[in-house]
């Protein structure tokens, strides 16, 4: 039985197979590939895109979705996550999609289930489906020619699980990862080139990925205001002028902090394309994990 906890759970060949399936799901035509299958979603952190994307993907494939309301679940009565998941597993779901603020929690639940677990984000650690849809967006834009392409990931690269997953995934496809952040948000490793402002590197980039400031993961205030942060890290029309790069953002976008209003309308900005691709990629992942499950 296969789970998706981090992007390394899939080989490069498996990822390319997922992309092949995802292309077929881009037209959003309903089908019955997963008819009779039941998928449980457990979101202990807020989500708009990821949760809705999984739900729409599942329903387009003919599966049923059961959303556990964590606000009224027995975890509020003191039940452990392990007991909660073990009880859900006893009901016979075909997959469990989970998001939690605790790093490593989805992986720790594997021994309690007989179905695939899909990590929809665990604290600062990992967000594998987001990284896969980001890569799919890049891969399709460059017609599969990703070797040697350069990306700047801009913003809170220390706390962002999206940055973490992309740091691990994109180099597998030959993409040169560069990190741009203020000192307080810098990645603590040394295997990537790091810069202080986007202006230093933007001329050399094929892709720029802007990130949301992870305010909910900070214990102290680093900037007097988000506007102060935006001076060096917001993607503005001035930065876009005369340049041809792909602009990505995992969402939600803080307008005029991460990306300006004007740039969000620019055809080089692929934020909504990422969302569309996310449904197709997650549909392909659900198909793979559920149909290949050998209990």
Swiss-Prot record:
The keyword Flavoprotein does not apply. It comes from the Bacteria. It catalyses: carbamoyl phosphate + L-aspartate = N-carbamoyl-L-aspartate + phosphate + H(+). GO terms for molecular function: amino acid binding; aspartate carbamoyltransferase activity. Keywords: Pyrimidine biosynthesis, Transferase. GO terms for biological process: 'de novo' pyrimidine nucleobase biosynthetic process; 'de novo' UMP biosynthetic process; amino acid metabolic process. Pathway: Pyrimidine metabolism; UMP biosynthesis via de novo pathway; (S)-dihydroorotate from bicarbonate: step 2/3. The keyword Cell division does not apply. It is an enzyme of class 2 (transferase). L-aspartate binds at residues 77, 161, 212. Catalyzes the condensation of carbamoyl phosphate and aspartate to form carbamoyl aspartate and inorganic phosphate, the committed step in the de novo pyrimidine nucleotide biosynthesis pathway. HAMAP family: Asp_carb_tr (MF_00001). This is Aspartate carbamoyltransferase catalytic subunit. The gene is pyrB.
């Amino acid at each position: 039985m296969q789970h998706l906890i981090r992007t390394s759970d899939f080989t490069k060949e498996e990822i390319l197979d997922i992309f092949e399936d995802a292309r077929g799901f881009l037209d959003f035509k309903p089908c019955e590939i997963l008819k009779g299958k039941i998928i449980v979603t457990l979101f202990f952190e807020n989500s708009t895109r990821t949760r809705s994307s999984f739900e729409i993907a599942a329903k387009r494939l003919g599966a049923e979705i059961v959303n556990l309301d964590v606000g009224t679940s027995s975890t509020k009565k003191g039940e452990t996550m392990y007991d909660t998941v073990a009880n859900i597993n006893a009901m016979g779901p075909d997959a469990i999609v989970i998001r939690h603020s605790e790093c490593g929690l989805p992986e720790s639940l594997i021994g309690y289930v007989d179905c695939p677990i899909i990590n929809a984000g665990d604290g600062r650690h990992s967000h594998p489906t987001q990284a896969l849809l980001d890569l799919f967006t890049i891969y399709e834009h460059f017609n599969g020619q990703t070797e040697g392409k350069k990306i700047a990931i801009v913003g809170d690269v220390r706390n962002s699980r999206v940055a973490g997953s992309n740091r691990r995934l994109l180099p597998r496809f030959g993409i040169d990862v560069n990190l741009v952040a203020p000192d307080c948000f810098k990645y603590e490793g040394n295997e990537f080139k790091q810069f202080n402002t986007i202006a230093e590197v933007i001329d050399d980039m094929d892709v720029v990925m802007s990130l949301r400031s992870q305010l909910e993961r900070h214990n102290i205030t680093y900037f007097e205001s988000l506007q102060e942060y935006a001076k060096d890290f917001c993607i503005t029309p001035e930065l876009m002028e005369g340049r041809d790069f792909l602009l990505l953002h995992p969402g939600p976008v803080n307008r005029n902090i991460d990306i300006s209003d004007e740039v969000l309308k620019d055809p080089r900005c692929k934020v909504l394309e990422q969302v569309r691709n996310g449904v197709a990629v997650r549909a392909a992942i659900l198909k793979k994990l559920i149909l290949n499950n050998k209990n």
